[in-house]
Amino acid sequence: MTVPSPLAARRASSTLAAVKRPLRILLSLAGALAAVPLLYLLAALILAVIPANPGWHEARQGVRIFVRTNGVHTWIMVPKVSADMDWRPLVPGADLKDPRWGNGNYVALGYGNRQFYLNTATWADLTVRNAFWALVGSGDSLIHADHDNDPQPSDIQRPIVLSHDEYVRLVRFIRASFRTDARGRTIPLLGRGYGNSDVFYEAVGPYNAFYTCNSWTGQALRAAGVRTGVWTPLSDSIMWRLR
């Protein structure tokens, strides 16, 4: 029987160690990557529970808005005309595929990733590529304006009454999210809606996993002074407080 020489044994041991080291590094990286979604969800849960504006109470009289959700995305629904703001010049019915929808008295405004908005009309259109860009961000963002009439409270549409001062602050935040042209007009993507009642507008700001559509909604509510989580990347981060 041939006995391996000490030199051969040392070489084999050295080769095995050389293989194990990068393998350990790869396994450590894989473990770290696997932990990222869990840490994200944990942070989302904790920071949604910690309230901004903890002393806020809903106004008895004022402007009635709604926060709407489809389970993933949220919108803020505002009356088109009030003593404090007329939204019709910013989101006119003339921008819609069917301008008759512009006769409604409310408009739902939401913020989102450009690629995801334009290429994911329904969840059946969701692709890995669209989801990836929605998470990491692809630069441009859009405002989605969906015209409605006489919205009613429901599980997916929660009313909030704001004082006039609170509503003015909300309006200021939302208006600042619209990108405008040299004449101060909003910039619609004509013909690029999901149906006859909605249309997209160019928006200001980035979109990524840390500043999502729901983060925007939460920031808008915090700007108004409403009690909201300090970070609200998920729809449930917002809606659970409004039950």
Model-derived segments and their meaning:
Residues 1-17:
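Short, intrinsically disordered terminal tails adjacent to the first/last structured region
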Residues 7-9, 40, 54:
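A generic alpha-helix propensity feature with a strong bias for hydrophobic helices
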Residues 11-13, 155-162, 227-232:
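Short, exposed beta-strand "edge-strand" segments with a Pro/Gly-rich flavor and a Y/T-containing core
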